[in-house]
């Protein structure tokens, strides 16, 4: 099998089979899988992702489209830097070696990529254009620098965006995240929050789950800001944001973020307050905040209620109010907010009900809508009515204003690492921040660099960061931070349109190819990569790099590949190939000791539940692996790896070869007529095409297996419909080609076809062949089913009437009389009224 696969891979390579032109009169189709990080080896998760995309690409090609199906490398990132530290090798050397290896692996799987368009994000000829783009953003005030409280990963020694912190830990290292103040570069994605939110409804070919995740991440909140005067210091105010301003008369405290500026100005920092603030520093984002026990500490500060000066509210530093949401301050209404209620119970604060409820709000918060009570001029109004009225009132009295807030924050792009795209800025003592001139791009990374695992090597480089200021020519310092690697993946799909363009994009090529028709990848990228790519596309549109404002028309998120986990008697993880199964028990191959089988989980290095793809490929071949990852589960669902399932796919491929040998030996003079087989061939063509279009690839494979069984069952018959068997087998080979391209090309050639299979059109079905010669009708008497009968297509209404009224099961109800009436539902029901 491997020889056949290598043969066809070489032919496709020699013929440049999947290279496409930007100048073509065919309709275009752009299918793209999320580009991989070049770790050195592709894994089964890659194979599943890319096999899905490959089926779509090959199918659309057979449907007559000009198909762009490119591949590239998201090559910057921490693993390369860690490998450099471990192996004393430059990250570039490690990365390019991995790229070469993985490119060969992808080719060995038979994926139909246009390798002439390959991009590598660590290539200066790629990233110089994103440096230029960053400078353009800076000129438009869409890129800026500020000191910010950031998520610091103490293992990777770098800053992480909020989206990269999962349950308080770094998404790569797993380290507990710390909070630090650092000068950082940001992109103003918040300027596009409203458009990013509004356009979600138009992404009709995206999964609802992803659209919902983006909506929640952007998190639009409409409410009001109130101005609370500080008691005994009425020149000072605390501005408070609330999404439920109508509950203002239920306020019992003001909650502020631990880093609210008023703490430094007006609040005495007692040791207790300092300790509390330190504890708050460990809460890294909204996801961890939701899980944390709500806590707070009283300050010496009090404020005056904006509508009732007799009400004095304490100011409490809390662990659940964030400075980067709203104003960093809230009014607490414990009766109608779960977080406020939890804190009020803990700190013995008043709980004042202002919405009618059928529960005791002292025991549990009532968070539903209702009628306002205990609320002065708002009494008797619904929540929405009260909300509008209170906003009008605070604006009239100038004690507040209507306000819209977003959960989405500006994107912090600074990373304190070496192996990334250098940020093209210079710091001069005379001129302050100075952009690198366009003519000096790209700013490249040095080759002579030392890695010791401590901080950013660019900070310690003896010469690289030292440069003369482009404005005054005096000594200056380069920015030593590099871009977040999501920067590279936020625009790469535009570069594929012409990867050799002499600007960021070739706009004419982008106008032809964009948007991407189908983008395929994991749902874990829903609120990072996909959101950033949408943001970049909008800005690139404004910079005249592209004409579209949304990058991906359709999105498909595939499930993960799972495998059982194993542990030895010492609780150490074991690889699957270290384990053998006997009598429904698992044993260590070497020691013979009993092994515990754990849960079936996502394949991961840490739990060793991986399979060696190269070994499997040598044993079973690429086609069998492709078929298995597509046939055993719907593509959007998780797939459990199974050697027995893989062996079944290998047997099916062997069966195809056997079927070819039988069919090749058949003589055309041995013939019969099998209308049912002919009908099944045409039905299979119809439904396989529909299944592929709907990504029901496992269902398509099941239909093709059914057709193969129907064809092979003819082999044992004395009188065989040879013509239909041969036609059906030719169709089967064509239908299977997008799934198992190597063996189908081989069989197609052996069948005597001159044209390459990948160049042929997808088979067409004949609608007239889908109909049966007969049909079954339900026979009712007075609306109740009494019998069924199979009629010929040619049967007239008169014949149907005569046959049905003479059926024995009908006759006993007629009792020798004529029916009063006969009602027909054509080809479905005949109802005899007696």
From Swiss-Prot:
PROSITE patterns: AA_TRNA_LIGASE_I (PS00178)
Motif annotated as 'HIGH' region, chain positions: 36-46
Stored Pfam families: Anticodon_1, tRNA-synt_1, tRNA-synt_1_2, tRNA-synt_1g
Membership in a protein family: Belongs to the class-I aminoacyl-tRNA synthetase family.
Enzymatic reactions: tRNA(Leu) + L-leucine + ATP = L-leucyl-tRNA(Leu) + AMP + diphosphate
InterPro entries: aa-tRNA-synth_I_CS (IPR001412), aa-tRNA-synth_Ia (IPR002300), Leu-tRNA-ligase (IPR002302), Leu_tRNA-synth_edit (IPR025709), M/V/L/I-tRNA-synth_anticd-bd (IPR013155), Methionyl/Leucyl_tRNA_Synth (IPR015413), Rossmann-like_a/b/a_fold (IPR014729), tRNAsynth_Ia_anticodon-bd (IPR009080)
Keyword Oxidoreductase: no
A GO molecular-function descriptor: leucine-tRNA ligase activity
Intracellular or extracellular location(s): Cytoplasm
Classification lineage: Bacteria, Pseudomonadati, Pseudomonadota, Alphaproteobacteria, Rickettsiales
EC numbers, comma separated: 6.1.1.4
Record's keyword terms, sorted: Aminoacyl-tRNA synthetase, ATP-binding, Cytoplasm, Ligase, Nucleotide-binding, Protein biosynthesis
Chain residues that bind ATP: 605
Motif ('KMSKS' region): 602-606
Cellular component aspect of the GO annotation: cytoplasm
Main subcellular localisation: cytoplasm
GO biological process: leucyl-tRNA aminoacylation
Protein name: Leucine--tRNA ligase
Primary enzyme class: ligase
Biological source species: Rickettsia canadensis (strain McKiel)
Record keyword S-adenosyl-L-methionine present: no
Transmembrane parts of this sequence: none
